[in-house]
Swiss-Prot record:
CDD domains associated with the record: GrpE
A Pfam family matched in the record: GrpE
Gene Ontology molecular function terms on file: adenyl-nucleotide exchange factor activity; protein homodimerization activity; protein-folding chaperone binding; unfolded protein binding
The name this protein goes by in its record: Protein GrpE
Entry function: Participates actively in the response to hyperosmotic and heat shock by preventing the aggregation of stress-denatured proteins, in association with DnaK and GrpE. It is the nucleotide exchange factor for DnaK and may function as a thermosensor. Unfolded proteins bind initially to DnaJ; upon interaction with the DnaJ-bound protein, DnaK hydrolyzes its bound ATP, resulting in the formation of a stable complex. GrpE releases ADP from DnaK; ATP binding to DnaK triggers the release of the substrate protein, thus completing the reaction cycle.
Family in the record: Belongs to the GrpE family.
Oligomeric and partner information: Homodimer.
Cellular component aspect of the GO annotation: cytoplasm
Keywords: Chaperone, Cytoplasm, Stress response
Naturally occurring in which organism (per UniProt): Parageobacillus thermoglucosidasius (Geobacillus thermoglucosidasius)
Ranges of Basic and acidic residues composition bias in the record: 20-67
Length: 224
C-alpha cells in the first residue's frame, strides 16, 4: 500500500514538472530563433538579390538584341578603322621601300660612273696638251736638230696616248664618216664631189671619248 502511494506521488510530481520542461524547451527554441533571425534575414536578402540579378540578366530580349547589335556595330567600326590604318601603313612602307630602292640604284650608278670615268677630269686637262703636240708635229723640220726635237716630241706624244688608251681614252673617227651630232661638231659646210652629202670631209680638231662617254666632239667640215 505504501509502495502504491509512492508511485502515485511520483506520477503527480512528473505531471507537475512536465509543463515546466515543455515551457523551458519552448523558451530555448524562441531564444535560438531570435539569435539566428539576422542570419536568416541576410540569407533571404541574398536569395532575393540573386533572383533580381537573374531577372536583370534575362531582361527584355529585344533590348538585349539591340545592345548586341550596337556592340557588334561598334566592333565592326573599330575593325574597319584598324584595317584602314594597316592599309595606310602598308602603302607608306611600299613608298618608302620604292624610294630606298631608287636611291640605292642611283647611288650604285653614280659610284660605278665615278669609278668608270674617274680619269675624265685629267683627260680634259690633257686634251689641250695633245692639241699642242699635234700642231707641233705638223711642222716640217728644216734641219737635223729640228728633226731630232720633233722625234722626241712624237715619242712623248705616243707615250701620253698609250697611257690614256689604258684608261679607255680613244680618238673619235671623223674623216669619211657620216656626220653624227653626238660625235662631231660641224663648223663649216663645203661642197666636195669626193664625198656623199652630210659626210665629214676634214677634221679641224680631234675629238676624244672616255669609254662610251664623249669628252670632246671632233670639230669638222661637212659636205653639203
Amino acid at each position: 500500500m505504501e509502495k502504491e502511494r509512492d508511485v502515485a506521488q511520483e506520477q503527480a510530481t512528473y505531471e507537475q514538472e512536465s509543463p515546466n520542461a515543455e515551457r523551458q524547451e519552448e523558451l530555448k527554441e524562441n531564444e535560438h530563433q531570435e539569435k539566428n533571425a539576422p542570419e536568416e534575414q541576410e540569407k533571404v536578402r541574398e536569395e532575393n538579390g540573386r533572383q533580381d540579378a537573374q531577372k536583370d540578366e534575362i531582361g527584355d530580349p529585344e533590348k538585349a538584341k539591340e545592345e548586341q547589335n550596337e556592340e557588334l556595330a561598334a566592333a565592326n567600326a573599330k575593325i574597319a578603322e584598324l584595317e584602314a590604318k594597316i592599309k595606310e601603313m602598308e602603302n607608306r612602307y611600299l613608298r618608302l621601300y620604292a624610294d630606298f630602292e631608287n636611291f640605292r640604284r642611283r647611288t650604285r650608278r653614280e659610284m660605278e660612273a665615278a669609278e668608270k670615268y674617274r680619269a675624265q677630269s685629267l683627260v680634259s686637262d690633257l686634251l689641250p696638251v695633245l692639241d699642242n703636240f699635234e700642231r707641233a708635229l705638223k711642222i716640217k723640220a728644216e734641219d737635223e736638230q729640228a728633226k731630232s726635237i720633233l722625234q722626241g716630241m712624237e715619242m712623248v706624244y705616243r707615250s701620253v696616248l698609250d697611257a690614256l688608251k689604258k684608261e679607255g681614252v680613244e680618238a673619235i673617227e671623223a674623216v669619211g664618216k657620216p656626220f653624227d651630232p653626238h660625235l662631231h661638231q660641224a663648223v663649216m659646210q663645203v661642197e666636195d664631189s669626193n664625198y656623199e652629202p652630210n659626210t665629214v670631209v676634214e677634221e679641224l680638231q680631234k675629238g676624244y671619248k672616255l669609254k662610251d662617254r664623249v669628252i670632246r666632239p671632233a670639230m669638222v667640215k661637212v659636205s653639203q
